[in-house]
UniProtKB/Swiss-Prot annotation:
Positions of Mn(2+) binding: 175, 241
Cofactors: prenylated FMN; Mn(2+)
UniProt organism field: Escherichia coli (strain K12)
Pfam families, A to Z: UbiD, UbiD_C, UbiD_N
Signal peptide per UniProt: none
GO biological-process terms attached to the record: protein hexamerization; ubiquinone biosynthetic process
HAMAP family: UbiD
Record's protein name: 3-octaprenyl-4-hydroxybenzoate carboxy-lyase
Length: 497
């Protein structure tokens, strides 16, 4: 993979500006609702990243819509365009289950992958840009950061792109995760992480191992894009997000130890929040407008107390909004879709394509096309999608089609469903499965059903009827009409000869 070189977020913004992918907004704009409205209109039009240089009431600029197009996601992952993200997926598939070289020629072919692994270790710095300014104790005031309020009925300002860094008591490597954080005081945020997410698991293990002790947490804002995207990519459990970011960037990820704890944060981050979670301290979070297009219900989550704020000189606050697709998470889903395909194909070689339509909230519905090889094959693939990667444990609907269907064309998919499916025979319903906490359609919070649709041609054993033969054109006739098509002038005002 030929990486697009950048060292930090500011380098990346310079790169975007050179390519016409960044717009500076000098007009004063309010972080309360107004930035969301502008960013939403811009994203829906496929517009640039936005740097609001004069947010009303604040001296700190706000960066929004950074990953508002698949192209910018690809650029953030070191690639020129979205199609190149298949190579990222192939690398992840290799790292997930590396195969030893079969001989000298195979070793030579795999050499680029082995060389990339050299960029995996982090580089620890003693001093770092993210610690150029340090605020602690009573001077900590999160209200000085232009935290956005995105929707009219949101409970409070919300940090959306915080890269939360944690470490469990029995783990060597840290976990990086993106969890939203509600502002509830000058030094307090609500850490909304679901119980199965890495940060929450680290916290649960800490509470069991160290009853009553404070759990150290740090949150990086404005890290370099490779590190941010590493936190939302299906990285193998044996690989740290920092290591993966190094692979994407082509250089080792630079980190620095926090001022108040032993966690390591991206050295070039714009802002770092350091602090702790007091065991048992929780607060009601929400409601907030979410990526589903609805306000979610209120629930209790741990409170994150901020003891230190470190930042760069002239720091930039990186933010986003979530709402009914398309939004930034939906765009990320479109780009990361290309990363998923090679990973799935490594486990299931019969998969031809895999598509997560953004209008399905990026993960709730999947369309898979396969080279079908036996009766019941489609059902095996459904079960594989639901179980192989944890990213798809919340996928409610899986549609499986043959490889003559374009998974990304609804006309094709609907045709396959309506001509190759019997609703009773070809629908799989699975009850009492993990479901997204935000899915209010499920009968119980976090627990619901899944549906698989087998829209493949049926094999012997799956049907007793003679199966339909698809209509195919005569290639000789097609070639002849191609040759005389322009002469026919059907779509021209002139008359045919």
């Amino acid at each position: 993979m030929d990486a697009m070189k950048y060292n930090d977020l500011r380098d990346f913004l310079t790169l975007l500006e050179q390519q016409g992918e960044l717009k500076r907004i000098t007009l004063p704009v309010d972080p309360h609702l107004e930035i969301t409205e502008i960013a939403d209109r811009t994203l829906r039009a496929g517009g640039p990243a936005l740097l609001f240089e004069n947010p009303k009431g604040y001296s700190m600029p706000v960066l929004c819509n950074l990953f508002g197009t698949p192209k910018r996601v690809a650029m953030g992952m070191g690639q020129e365009d979205v199609s190149a993200l298949r190579e990222v997926g192939k690398l992840l598939a290799f790292l997930k289950e590396p195969e030893p070289p079969k001989g000298f020629r195979d070793l030579f072919d795999k050499l680029p992958q082995f060389k990339q692994v050299l960029n995996m270790p982090t580089k620890r710095l003693r001093g770092a840009p993210c610690q150029q300014k340090i605020v602690s104790g009573d001077d900590v005031d999160l209200n000085r950061i232009p935290i956005m309020t995105c929707w009219p009925e949101d409970a409070a300002p919300l940090i959306t792109w915080g890269l939360t860094v944690t470490r469990g008591p029995h783990k060597e490597r840290q976990n990086l995760g993106i969890y939203r954080q509600q502002l509830i005081g000058k030094n307090k945020l609500i850490m909304r992480w679901l119980s199965h997410r890495g940060g929450a698991l680290d916290y649960q293990e800490w509470c069991a191992a160290h009853p009553g002790e404070r759990f150290p947490v740090s949150v990086a804002l404005g890290a370099d894009p490779a590190t941010i995207l590493g936190a939302v990519t299906p990285v193998p459990d044996t690989l740290s997000e920092y290591a993966f970011a190094g692979l994407l960037r082509g250089t080792k990820t630079e980190v620095v130890k926090c001022i108040s704890n032993d966690l390591e944060v991206p050295a070039s981050a714009e802002i770092v929040l350091e602090g702790y979670i007091e065991q048992g301290e929780t607060a009601p979070e929400g409601p907030y407008g979410d990526h589903t297009g609805y306000y979610n219900e209120v629930d209790s989550f741990p409170v994150f107390t901020v003891t230190h704020i470190t930042q760069r000189e002239d720091a930039i606050y990186h933010s986003t909004y979530t709402g009914r697709p398309p939004d930034e998470p939906a765009v990320l889903g479109v780009a990361l879709n290309e990363v998923f395909v090679p990973i799935l194909q490594k486990q299931f070689p019969e998969i031809v394509d895999f598509y997560l339509p953004p209008e399905g909230c990026s993960y709730r519905l999947a369309v898979v096309t396969i080279k079908k090889q036996y009766a019941g094959h489609a059902k095996r693939v459904m079960m594989g999608v639901w179980s192989f990667l944890r990213q798809f444990m919340y996928t409610k609907f899986v549609i499986v089609c043959d490889d003559d269907v374009n998974a990304r064309d609804w006309n094709d998919v609907i045709w396959a469903i309506t001509t190759r499916m019997d609703p009773a025979r070809d629908t799989v319903l699975v009850e009492n499965t993990p479901i997204d906490y935000l899915d209010f359609a499920s009968p119980v919070s976090g627990l619901g059903s899944k549906m698989g649709l087998d829209a493949t041609n049926k094999w012997p054993g799956e049907t007793q009827r003679e199966w339909g033969r698809p209509i195919k054109k005569d290639p000789d006739v097609v070639a002849h009409i191609d040759a005389i098509w322009d002469e026919l002038a059907i779509f021209n005002n002139g008359k045919s000869a």
